[in-house]
């Protein structure tokens, strides 16, 4: 959950910015070093500080939202978003390529991840193993939203973390204001949004999700 919580038994685990002579040589060396530092700083600024090897920088990559945002999830057992149409999200993936998530995609499972969230770090290998051993049901799409990105927090950038984990799921990069997260009405990590073939929300879930439970839901929404 973005805000740390105390976990009780049975609850899902989640996490809720110029002299002469001999004295001249040291001076010239000092000037040269200063010049190199300035040049390096200019290059870093020009590159936008992107050290992710392809991560779309959150401060510059916008996320487009169309349609009605889902209401905030307050009670998963009585989720008012169930039956509501999924809003469309557009933006870029981890390599900067265009990507979209929307109600016209057919059955879809969306997983929300924050790179600094320890429960997300525990959930990613579960999904990776599930995909390798079981695989998604035919006709069901799996996508992810990398959100709440913060260069000052651990495990940054998310692209490097996900690459280390063998993550191959198409992943939309949220913007600096976490607009995609807000459109899905979520605030805890990891999070899941399951959508049926008509583009309507079937279930939302927060916290680590066992592979067996994930499999049960994605099979229920399969065409």
Positions of PLM-derived features:
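Short active-site neighborhood of thiol/selenol oxidoreductases, capturing the structured segment around
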Residues: 99-127
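A short beta-strand-turn-helix
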Residues: 78-108
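N-terminal targeting signals for export/organelle localization
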Residues: 1-85
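Hydrophobic beta-strand anchors of alpha/beta hydrolase catalytic cores
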Residues: 109-110, 142, 192
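Thiol/disulfide oxidoreductase modules built on the thioredoxin-like
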Residues: 28, 105-106, 163-167, 174-223
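Structural microenvironment flanking redox-active thiols in thiol-disulfide oxidoreductases
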Residues: 121-165, 173-182
């Amino acid at each position: 959950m973005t805000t740390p919580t105390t976990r009780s038994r049975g609850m899902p685990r989640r996490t809720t910015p110029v002299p002469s002579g001999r004295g001249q040589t040291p001076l010239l060396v000092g000037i040269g070093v200063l010049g190199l530092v300035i040049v390096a700083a200019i290059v870093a600024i020009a590159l936008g500080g992107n050290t992710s090897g392809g991560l779309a920088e959150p401060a510059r990559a916008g996320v487009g939202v169309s349609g009605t945002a889902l209401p905030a999830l307050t009670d998963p057992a009585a989720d008012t978003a169930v039956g509501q149409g999924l809003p469309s999200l557009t933006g870029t993936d981890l390599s900067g390529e265009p990507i979209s998530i929307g109600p016209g995609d057919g059955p879809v499972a969306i997983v929300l991840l924050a790179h600094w969230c320890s429960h997300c770090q525990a959930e990613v290998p579960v999904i990776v193993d599930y995909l390798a051993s079981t695989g998604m049901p035919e006709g069901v799409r799996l996508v992810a939203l990398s959100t709440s990105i913060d260069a000052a927090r651990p495990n940054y950038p998310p692209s490097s973390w996900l690459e280390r984990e063998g993550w191959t799921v198409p992943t939309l990069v949220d913007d600096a204001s976490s607009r995609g997260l807000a459109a899905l009405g979520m605030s805890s990590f990891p999070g899941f949004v399951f959508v049926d073939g008509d583009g309507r929300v079937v279930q939302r879930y927060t916290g680590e999700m066992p592979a067996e439970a994930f499999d049960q839901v994605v099979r229920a929404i399969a065409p």
